[in-house]
Each structure stands twice: as C-alpha cells, then as structure tokens.
C-alpha cells in the first residue's frame, strides 16, 4: 500500500464501534498528508491535506473525527466520512509531537473487566460493536478530550468535537514533550519529556497532580 511521498510517521485504526469490519485506518506522513486506507480494497480512499509541514501524530476518535498533529504547530480536526476539515486547534508555539484521547482505552475491541470479557464473542462482531459503543458513550457523555504535547515544553487539553479554544494550557516541563497518555478511566494524563521527568495531570481540567524527576 503506497501513496505517501515521504516516510510515514503514524497509524490509527477506525474505532471498532464505528466499523466492526475493521476495514479502514489512517496514516500520516512527513509529506504533510493524512491518507485513509481500505484494507479490503488495498487502496487509499481519501487524502486529507491542509498541514504545511510533517504530520507527527494522528488519532481516529470515537465520534468519527480524525485528529492530526503537525510540525506546522497546529492540530487539525477532520470528518472521516468525507474528509472535510472541521477546525484547526492553535496554541502551541513549536512542533506538536504527540496526541492522546481520553477514550483510547474505551475504544479497544475488548473491555478490561472480566464481566465484559466474558460477554465478548468473536463470532458476533455486530453485538461486540454495540458493546463497544456503549463503553465509549459511558466514557465520554460530554465528548472525548484530546491532549497534545509539544516541542514548546507545554501540553494543551482540548474538547475537540466542539471547541477551538483549549480547556487548559499545562506548563511545568523544562524540555520538549515526546509522549502523552490518558489513564484507562480518563481521569489522569501522564506526560513524558526530554527533561527526564514524568508529570501527572488532572484529565478533566489539566491541573498538575504529581511530578517525578530524577535527583
């Protein structure tokens, strides 16, 4: 499967509850493009272009939106169904390196609890998709949140389905941020940095909860 003009930087599958056939995933490239692929057709079905520099990270959200971070210092929100760019999220002063969604764990095919695992039946994908949708909706009744980390040493917390304005600008790291993750319940954000520290933040409002740094 070829199409990008430079190397590929990230991949993200369409959530199971949106497509239980697991046909589509998105890729991002150094060429600034996001491509949506159909694995059954083995071809690119859509190209999303608007970034002016390399795309560094992508997430396919549970509401049918694709989020992309770029070295052009922006995050873009795309409607996966037709490729329309819905909005641009501005705020970072340098490259945006990493993204995470509060629903990343909830959108996995199989839930983490023993009860939900017992209900999971690989032979019933439509029923499994309904269960996955219920988990997703329970996880984010007010919409999923997105966190971004940057070369400018900051993180931003967003409500990307509805707002262009960030919920919070999170500061404290002394060097670039290279990884962010929400906890499985979405309550905590962990961020890792070149400053050799990990910081924990409130996943709802962005306040710092705990920080650990090498002595």
What is the predicted role of each segment?
Residues 102-144:
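A surface-exposed beta-alpha-beta supersecondary segment
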Residues 149, 154, 158-215:
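C-terminal or late-domain output modules
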Residues 5, 27-31, 68-72, 80, ...:
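Conserved strand-to-loop turn within each blade of WD40 beta-propeller repeats
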Residues 12-22, 52, 58-64, 81-82, ...:
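Loop/turn segments within WD40 beta-propeller blades
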Residues 11, 34-38, 58, 75-80, ...:
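WD40-repeat beta-propellers
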Residues 5-7, 33-35, 52, 65, ...:
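A conserved positional marker within WD40/Gbeta-like beta-propeller blades
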Residues 2-8, 49-55, 82, 90-96, ...:
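WD40/WD-repeat beta-propeller blade N-cap
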């Amino acid at each position: 499967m070829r199409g990008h003009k430079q190397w590929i930087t990230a991949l993200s599958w369409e959530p199971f509850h949106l497509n239980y056939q697991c046909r589509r995933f998105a890729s991002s490239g150094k060429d600034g493009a996001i491509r949506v692929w159909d694995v059954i057709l083995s071809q690119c079905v859509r190209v999303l272009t608007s970034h002016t520099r390399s795309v560094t990270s992508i997430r396919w959200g549970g509401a049918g939106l694709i989020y992309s971070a770029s070295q052009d210092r922006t995050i873009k929100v795309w409607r996966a169904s037709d490729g329309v760019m819905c909005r641009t999220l501005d705020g970072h002063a340098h490259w945006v390196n990493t993204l995470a969604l509060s629903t990343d764990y909830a959108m996995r095919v199989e839930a983490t609890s023993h009860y939900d695992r017992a209900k999971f039946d690989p032979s019933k994908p439509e029923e499994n998709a309904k269960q996955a949708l219920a988990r997703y909706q329970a996880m984010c009744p007010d919409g999923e949140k997105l966190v971004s980390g940057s070369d400018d040493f900051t993180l931003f917390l967003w409500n990307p389905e509805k707002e262009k304005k960030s919920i919070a600008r999170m500061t404290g790291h002394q060097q670039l941020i290279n990884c962010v993750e929400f906890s499985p319940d979405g309550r905590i954000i962990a961020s890792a940095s070149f400053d050799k520290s990990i910081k924990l933040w409130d996943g709802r409002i962005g306040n710092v909860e705990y920080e650990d740094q090498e002595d």
